[in-house]
Design a protein with these regions (language model features):
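Bacterial N-terminal signal peptides that target proteins for export
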Residues: 1-11
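Histidine-rich, glycine-flanked metal-binding segment
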Residues: 26-30, 36-82
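C-terminal cap of metal-dependent C-N hydrolases
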Residues: 34, 357-409
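Metal-associated gating/positioning segment near the N- to mid-region
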Residues: 74-139
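Metal-cofactor-binding active-site regions of metalloenzymes
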Residues: 114-120, 124-125, 140-165
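Active-site core of metal-dependent hydrolases
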Residues: 186-309
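His/Asp/Glu-enriched, well-ordered alpha-helical/loop segment
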Residues: 284-369
């Protein structure tokens, strides 16, 4: 016969094991009645979202409010994973230019209000000054900051730094990535004006050795677009995909058709990022491309000091352009969440799976008469515009436009 002592021990052990599960049922924050769009998990319906310890605990219909410490009613609003912007310049500092400079932007000033929870800096730092970038900006920001490491050692520190082939060292870039694998997601080539393909080849070698994607920003006449795409591997990313500048052939030909070699690159698995910026997005390229099936894989904004005050403005504005150009809202959200997460090999991001980090955007579609401007000063008109109502970063509220989470003032 089993002794009473053994039974007591067994019961105590069971209670010990069950206790954490019972405690975990207490919900820190419950988003009720929102329309969830989570492309990875194929959710597109009214759902509740429960958050515990900064992570997604449950996404389901009618989660009881009784165990929730805080409840936010998202009725009439959309709920999605936090948006991911894969082309930004956020190595802000006091120097002229971009690297540690005044032309970069402090990310928290512009991300939260746009529903953006993750940004990827596009080569503003190189292997020489990345540690400064990490200490000065990355580690001190609420926004998650990832990085495409510039093949140039000093990154975007000015023309002389960008032109120094001797400083474009694949081994040094590789060792930097090995040291910071949680932050550096790829290699960047861009802003080189020489006649040699060496920088491109060095960047590609660094990306291959590190098993990361290459972000290509080469709008130079000596780097023909077709040759760039031919050198790129499946999973590599070309940005400023829909620009119309004299320095680089556009993706649309004189007859208004997507060039055949561009279609082949798309079939090969090359990814196309918007990279809007101040000069990287033209309706004359983007609209026929969209109609002919050349869709962007991501809505990189090319966030910097000048683009925020021009036609780009913010990521929501870029997304709104595509919504008004005819892209379905579900496809827009895919390209702002799960698709960019996949492109940078961070599949822990961009979705609301159980256990995932609770980076969340709660947003609305405003109805009205709106104008949208491209890099050439051309305008289209639309009747819908995305607006961020609430942004959560690791389960914490970092933006609340209309006080959804606030207590009502009583006189």
């Amino acid at each position: 016969m089993v002794s009473k002592k053994i039974i007591k021990i067994a019961i105590g052990l069971c209670l010990f094991l069950i206790a954490p599960l019972t405690e975990a049922q207490e919900i820190d924050l419950l988003l009720k009645n929102g329309h969830v769009i989570d492309p990875k998990n194929k959710i597109n319906s009214r759902m509740d979202v429960a958050i515990v310890d900064g992570k997604i605990f449950q996404v389901a219909s009618d989660i009881p409010e009784s165990n929730a410490k805080k409840v936010i009613d998202a009725k009439g609003l959309y709920v999605s994973p936090g948006f991911i912007d894969i082309h930004t310049h956020v190595f802000v500092g006091s120097k002229p230019g971009f690297a540690d400079g005044i032309n970069s932007m402090s990310p928290d000033d512009f991300t939260c209000r746009s529903g953006v929870t993750t940004v990827v800096d596009a080569g503003t730092s190189g292997w020489r000054n990345f540690p400064l970038f990490k200490d000065q900006v990355i580690d001190k920001s609420k926004t998650r900051i990832l990085t495409f490491l510039n093949i140039a050692g000093w990154g975007m520190s000015g023309k002389l730094a960008a032109e120094n082939i001797d400083d474009m060292n694949p081994d040094s870039a590789f060792f930097t990535i090995q040291k910071y694998p949680e932050t550096i997601v790829g290699i960047k080539i861009g802003h080189y004006e020489g006649k040699d393909w060496t920088p491109f080849d060095q960047a590609l070698a660094a990306a291959e050795k590190s098993n990361v994607p290459l972000l290509v920003e080469c709008h130079l006449p000596q780097y023909p677009l077709e040759d760039q795409l031919n050198r790129m591997r499946p999973g590599d990313i070309i940005t400023h995909s829909f620009e119309k500048v004299s320095e680089r052939m556009s993706v649309i030909d004189e007859q208004g058709l997507v060039r055949p070699f561009v279609k082949e690159a798309q079939k090969k698995g090359i990814l196309f990022d918007v990279g809007h910026g101040g000069a990287g997005f033209w309706f004359s390229e983007a609209m026929p491309a969209l109609k002919q099936g050349l869709l962007p894989n991501s809505f990189g904004t090319d966030l910097h000091r000048f683009s925020v005050n021009s036609g780009m403005k913010d990521m929501l504005n870029v997304m709104s352009k595509y919504l008004n150009m005819g892209m379905k809202k579900e496809d827009v959200i895919l390209r702002a969440t799960w698709a960019p997460a996949q492109s940078i090999k961070r599949e822990d991001l961009g979705h609301l799976s159980q256990g995932a980090v609770a980076d969340i955007a709660v947003w609305s579609i405003r109805k009205g008469n709106f104008g949208f401007i491209d890099a050439g000063g051309n305008k289209i008109e639309g009747d819908r515009k995305l607006e961020a109502e609430l942004t959560l970063r690791e389960g914490k509220i970092v933006w609340d436009l209309n006080g959804l989470a606030a207590k009502k003032f009583v006189e």
